[in-house]
Structure formats: C-alpha cells, structure tokens
Regions:
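Charged/polar low-complexity intrinsically disordered segments
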Residues: 3-6, 28
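Acidic, surface-exposed loops and disordered segments
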Residues: 18-243
C-alpha cells in the first residue's frame, strides 16, 4: 500500500508541474525567441571568427586588431537598436577633457540609413572604386554632435569617444568606420539636429579582408587594395618611441 500511495503522489506532482508548464509556455514564447536569436547570433560570431568551444577573452590587443575600418558590410545583417544603444552607452564611462561631456549621439537604423548614405564619402584614397561597392553599404550609423562650438577639447573628446565606441562594436561582434567626409548641413537638415554634426560612425558586420603592413621605404601611408585584400600601412612599433 505504501508503494502504491507513493506512486499516486508522484503522479499527482508530475501532473501539477506539467499543467503549470503548459499554462506559462505561451507567455514565455517571445522571451524564448529573443533568447534563441541572441544565442544564434553569438554562435555566428564565433563561427565567423573561426572559433570553437569557449569564446576567448576580448582582450584589448584582440579588439584593437579586430577594430579595422571597414568600407563594405554584410547587407543581410541588420544592426539592432539595442546594439547601437550599447555602443553609445560607453560614453558614460570614458574620460572627457575638463569633464565637459558635451558630445551627444543620434543613432540611425536601417529605415533611415539612406538619408546618411546620400551625403557621405568613403575610401578617399581609392576614388576609382566608388566605395562602398553596390550591395555592401552599411545600414546603421551613429551621428556625433557637440552641444558647444567645436574646439580642441571637443576634438579630444571626439577621438576618445569614437575609438571607445568602435572597440565596443568589435567586442559585440560588429565593425565600423569613422566618417569625416560628409555634408554637415544636409545631415543636420535630414535629421533635424539641434547641434552641428562632427563625425559619423558606420556600424555593421564587415566583410572585407584587411591586413596591416609596415610603411615601406618610400614612406607612403595611403591604404591600397590588391587581390581582394585591403592593406593599411602602419608605423613600425620600434619607430614610435622618441629616443
């Protein structure tokens, strides 16, 4: 009799738990979908980087190497609002000249991207390529403005901010580029900006193969492309230190 009673109690508990799960499953569908979507994105990021198993630590050295200026992006990958917000939010943690914190940011998602694309220029050293190539345009941007007139302290903040945001983009599996060649007045009009735009960051999933190379004997610092690879000349580490 004791065994039969135990089995009946066990069956009753199982029935209650199953009913509870059935009732709450429908309420959790959206949460589960979002969770699975994020996990799939993390998996794609690891796969694209040739990783397997545990994701390696995002050290500063790795992020700096990954943080290359991409001028071509995967058109099938649409940058989300929360990703841009996460990138912008690093500005609440970084240094600021005189602690003025005068920079403000206008995120631009895919539905407004064309309003930016019409007024920017990429690849100034490769004008014959007319970058970005058709079908590789970025679909998300961050417009950086200042609440005060531009000066040397604002420019210091601008550099710190841009690099910090691009490193954050690299950490979450994205790429970007700083764009200074754009029509400021048209951008300001298109987005009804209260303040003058100083810089634009394009954000997306870069598709270009980019390699760093030492500056040659001729001293040429212009980037160039050969056989599908984008080469960026850099000063040798041993030449950086003043002796």
């Amino acid at each position: 009799h004791g065994k039969a009673l135990f089995l009946r109690v066990l069956f009753f508990v199982f029935t209650v738990v199953l009913r509870y799960l059935c009732i709450h499953t429908s309420n959790r569908t959206d949460m589960a979908d979002n969770y699975l979507e994020r996990k799939m994105e993390e998996y794609r990021n690891r796969t694209a980087a040739g990783q397997s198993g545990r994701r390696p630590l995002a050290t500063l050295g790795r992020l700096l190497l990954k943080n290359r200026s991409h001028r071509g992006y995967d058109a099938n990958f649409i940058v989300r609002e929360d990703q841009l917000r996460r990138i912008i939010e690093v500005n609440a943690k970084i240094p600021s000249a005189r602690n003025q914190q005068v920079l403000r940011f206008r995120p631009v998602l895919s539905d407004e991207a064309q309003k930016v694309l019409a007024h920017i220029r990429l690849g100034g050293a490769l004008p014959h390529l007319h970058l970005p190539l058709p079908g590789t345009e970025p679909n998300a941007f961050i417009i950086v403005c200042s609440t005060v007139e531009e000066n040397r302290y604002v420019d210091i903040d601008l550099g710190i901010s841009a690099q910090s945001m691009l490193l954050q983009a690299a950490e979450i599996g994205l790429n970007g580029i700083c764009i200074g060649a754009f029509d400021k007045e048209r951008i300001r009009q298109e987005f009804g900006l209260e303040w003058e735009p100083l810089l634009i960051l394009a954000i997306g999933r870069g598709i270009e193969k980019i390699e760093l190379v030492p500056i040659g004997a001729d001293g040429d610092r212009n980037y160039y492309r050969e056989n599908g690879t984008h080469y960026v000349p850099k000063v040798r580490p041993e030449e950086l230190t003043i002796k």
